[in-house]
């Protein structure tokens, strides 16, 4: 029964996507972040929901009267498209081309849907709905994981929807870390039952992240919570409440969780931690051999380890490890051009958020932009911190932030300059206001 309900909901949304592509984009975001089909039991799990939803959005764009062309020209989008070019080049010269092209298709879908989001997001209402769908979809797994973690006393590991990019414990930890700023800031903007729902998802996401047993996720969680409190108008009561809550919670936290977190300070004695350091050395050796094109997607194999790091195979009894680092993974897979494009994309997003906050100072009708810029900056910071220890460089959310930031820049510049014709839009008003 559950399968029929999920499939029916998706199929019924397809005509909406054709005639109202923005709402089709919301359906796509819901599917991509909540994975409702993974909550079913049989045929819905393999039903191509995301593909059909994306096709309906693309079909709807054919009938769309206009597109947000100005947002596409923003530097964040340019860096993202340059990054996609390096994906393509690295796949042409990949060590394992058959595997690389399969992965290239998956990542190209992420980039394509981010471009479509840039085209479709045009005003505050649309950005709010888009971000709200993302927050509630990922937040659902925080709600579910938090209840599971508390019910089991933290003695079992919290996982995400399997099989998906968010399925592993490290992966769902990163996704929730990135989502928590959204839940917090959106709750400050909403009212009634929606505000309470967002707050519930936020607070249950804390034990959900903790009981993934991911040290990187716990570290990012601590940073996110600290910055949320420091940025709040009620920082003193929040910090006091967090300290008291933490002290009261310690007796109920499993000893094995505390022991695992303590290995952060004794990483030299931890096999898992040292394997990551050794694997980064392995990645650097490959990057030196493939500086311009990279080794391509999914380059890890026993044969490559035997060539570049045979001593690590001996050290870890023949086990082939993942990169466990978004930056080393990009560098090794796509070379230095891909690495610089990836870093620039993130830097441009962070800088633009700062410029947006500076630009809207004193503009009472644009205060909401500061809220969105704050939440996106914190979300990206969580991505960078947690990404130092996990492979999530192709996760959808950072690329969707590119779309949202580009659209926010267009909206702010349009409002500050009084020019409402996007074809005649220039970025000068935003940059001038931010200086």
For every predicted segment, state its role.
Residues 1-3, 44-51, 102-104, 164-177, ...:
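Membrane-interface micro-motifs in multi-pass membrane enzymes
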């Amino acid at each position: 029964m559950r399968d029929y309900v999920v499939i029916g909901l998706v199929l019924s949304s397809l005509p909406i996507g054709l005639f109202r592509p923005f709402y089709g984009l919301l359906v796509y975001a819901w599917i991509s972040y909540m994975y409702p089909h993974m909550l079913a039991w049989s045929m819905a799990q393999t039903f191509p929901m995301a593909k059909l939803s994306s096709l309906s959005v693309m079909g709807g764009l054919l009938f769309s009267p206009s597109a947000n062309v100005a947002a596409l020209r923003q530097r964040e989008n340019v860096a993202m498209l340059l990054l996609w070019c390096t994906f393509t080049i690295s796949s042409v010269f990949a060590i394992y081309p058959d595997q690389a092209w399969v992965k290239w298709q998956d990542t190209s879908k992420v980039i394509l849907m981010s471009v479509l989001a840039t085209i479709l997001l045009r005003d505050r209402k649309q950005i709010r709905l888009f971000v709200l769908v993302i927050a509630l979809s990922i937040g659902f797994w925080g709600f579910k994981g938090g209840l599971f973690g508390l019910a089991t006393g933290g003695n079992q590991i919290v996982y995400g929807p399997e099989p998906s990019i968010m399925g592993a414990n490290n992966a769902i930890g990163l996704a929730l870390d990135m989502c928590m700023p959204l839940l917090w800031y959106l709750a400050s903007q909403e009212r009634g039952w929606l505000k309470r729902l967002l707050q519930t998802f936020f607070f249950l996401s804390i034990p959900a992240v903790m009981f993934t047993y991911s040290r990187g996720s716990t570290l990012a969680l601590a940073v996110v919570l600290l910055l949320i409190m420091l940025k709040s108008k009620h920082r003193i009561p929040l910090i006091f409440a967090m300290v008291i809550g933490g002290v009261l919670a310690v007796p109920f936290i499993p000893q094995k969780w505390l022991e695992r977190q303590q290995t952060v300070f004794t990483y030299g004695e931890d096999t898992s931690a040292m394997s990551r350091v050794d694997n980064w050395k392995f990645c650097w050796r490959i990057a030196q051999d493939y500086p311009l094109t990279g080794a391509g997607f999914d380059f890890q194999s026993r044969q490559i380890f035997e060539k570049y790091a045979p001593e690590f195979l001996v050290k870890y009894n023949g086990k082939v490890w993942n990169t466990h680092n978004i930056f080393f993974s990009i560098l090794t897979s796509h070379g230095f051009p891909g690495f610089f494009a990836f870093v620039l994309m993130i830097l441009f997003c962070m800088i633009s958020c700062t410029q947006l906050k500076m630009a809207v100072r004193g503009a009472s009708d644009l205060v909401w932009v500061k809220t969105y810029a704050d939440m996106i900056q914190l979300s990206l910071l969580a991505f960078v911190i947690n990404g130092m220890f996990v492979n999530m460089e192709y996760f959808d959310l950072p690329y969707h932030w590119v779309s949202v930031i580009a659209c926010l820049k267009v909206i702010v510049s349009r409002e500050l300059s009084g020019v409402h014709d996007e074809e005649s839009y220039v970025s000068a008003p935003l940059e001038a206001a931010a200086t």
